[in-house]
Structure formats: structure tokens, C-alpha cells
């Protein structure tokens, strides 16, 4: 038994089922915590520090790096999620990504509703509130914040702060949900 197995055996009764489903072709180069009933599907790639919540889905060819995925998050198809936090039941459509480095490599400023925060670092992805839906093929630029219960239309390039309960249709067109 290796040292990692010994550490796990100190935390869990190994006779009980720890019910995450990890496909044989998935690669996990943790440290990583994969929650109960989570699925890490075919060719998923998890590196850096990662917490994948209970019932979350990390799908086919999805890459995670330095992330927190709350319970029931779905990143099911060809996603990249780096240096990001995704709230409860957040869902990213196929091919949507969190960009975590600016193209000019400058430090990232997070733009809030009332102020800007200079982070002093070059890598930050996105922060999604609970029940956020991100459409297929969308890019969430570094430091993007999307408030809970919001929707991002497919093929969007999102930056800055999107208030809770909003629909992001395209740059400059954000409407309140009815």
C-alpha cells in the first residue's frame, strides 16, 4: 500500500463505497478532491489543485486547473476551466472556456459593479455564481464575474461583471431576466 492509500484510509472507512465515477482514460495529477457521485469522464484532464463537488460532471476532453467546482457543476464537453470557481449547479456548454491569462500578459484587474480590484497576478479565470448557464462556444475572459441565476448566450466573449439574474446576449447587451 502506498502513502496516498494510507492517507485515504485514515480519512475513510475503505469498506464503504466512495462513489465517484472516474473513467479509465481520465488523468488526475492532483492534489484533487473528487466528491461523491461526481463523474470524471473519458479523457478528462485534471491538474493543479482541484476540488470537484458532489454530483459534478467533468466531461469528455475537459481540462481543469486550479479550480473549485461546487456540487452539481457540469463542464461536460470539451471545456477548459482554469484558475476559476464555479458555483452550485453552474453549467458550461460544449466548448466554452474560462480564459485565465490576458493576451498581453499584463496583471489582471477584476471589474466589479462599484470598483475595480487589481489582483497583482497574471492568472485568474472566471467566477460563476450558482445556477449560471454558459452557452456553447463562449469565452469567459480573465477575471470575469457572472452573478447567480444568469445566462450567457452561445458564442459570447464575456468580460467584466454580469449582475445576478441577467441574460448576456452580446457585448453591451445585458438584460434582466423576467
Where do the model's predicted regions map?
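Extended, small-residue-rich solenoid/repeat segments and analogous flexible loops
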Residues: 1-45, 49
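Short, functional N-terminal and low-complexity linear motifs
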Residues: 4-9, 22-24, 54-60, 99, ...
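The repeat-register position in solenoid repeat domains
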Residues: 24, 36, 53-54, 65, ...
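Transmembrane beta-barrel architecture of outer membranes
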Residues: 41, 47, 51-53, 59, ...
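Glycine-rich hexapeptide-repeat left-handed beta-helix
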Residues: 60-61, 66-72, 76-178
Amino acid at each position: 500500500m502506498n502513502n496516498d492509500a494510507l492517507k485515504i484510509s485514515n480519512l475513510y472507512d475503505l469498506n464503504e463505497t466512495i462513489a465517484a465515477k472516474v473513467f479509465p482514460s481520465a488523468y488526475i495529477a492532483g492534489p484533487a478532491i473528487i466528491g461523491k457521485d461526481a463523474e470524471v469522464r473519458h479523457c478528462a484532464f485534471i491538474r493543479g489543485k482541484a476540488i470537484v463537488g458532489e454530483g459534478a460532471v467533468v466531461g469528455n476532453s475537459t481540462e481543469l486547473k486550479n479550480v473549485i467546482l461546487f456540487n452539481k457543476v457540469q463542464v461536460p464537453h470539451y471545456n477548459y476551466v482554469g484558475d476559476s470557481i464555479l458555483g452550485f449547479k453552474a453549467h458550461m456548454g460544449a466548448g466554452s472556456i474560462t480564459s485565465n491569462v490576458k493576451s498581453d500578459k499584463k496583471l489582471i484587474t477584476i471589474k466589479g459593479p462599484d470598483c475595480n480590484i487589481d489582483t497583482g497576478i497574471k492568472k485568474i479565470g472566471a467566477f460563476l455564481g450558482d445556477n449560471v448557464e454558459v452557452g456553447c462556444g463562449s469565452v469567459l475572459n480573465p477575471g470575469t464575474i457572472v452573478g447567480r441565476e444568469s445566462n450567457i448566450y452561445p458564442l459570447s466573449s464575456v468580460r467584466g461583471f454580469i449582475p445576478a439574474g441577467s441574460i448576456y446576449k452580446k457585448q453591451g447587451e445585458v438584460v434582466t431576466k423576467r
